[in-house]
């Protein structure tokens, strides 16, 4: 996480690294129910519900990775050394205890009985038919550029997210940072 990397970016730069890609740093869901665990989590035998690709809060840094200040410092240090920093965006699915599910039940897909629909990794699937959800996620992209000065994003499971969502997101990111990077998985 960002706390571990602070002060190590000199080593990265000295070894020719000019882009640092951080896996999800947002607050991971630790819901213990195994029906929401990925196949890899189940097979590992570790009985650990935490998975950084099962997001609980898109606007909070997971304490396991540090604080907002840690990420700010890391990005600032990386930029001073000529490196760019990109974050992983996990928008195909979220965690079962995602903070928005209770207040915005339409942010996730539901079956005919109104139950949350899980995607292929057993995590609740995001509902891109919701205009409010799209705005929430575009604002999330803007948030990390504006607050932390990140240089772009790696878009997890990008083919499963509507292309027009990514296109609009790219336009909005370029308005903030013209040389923004977006990498599709």
Task: Label each residue range with its predicted role.
Residues 2-4, 11, 15-18, 24-148, ...:
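Substrate-binding/active-site clefts of carbohydrate-active enzymes
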Residues 64-65, 159-164:
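Acidic-and-aromatic substrate-binding clefts and catalytic sites of carbohydrate-active enzymes
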Residues 86, 152-158, 183:
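Short catalytic-loop micro-motif centered on adjacent basic/acidic residues
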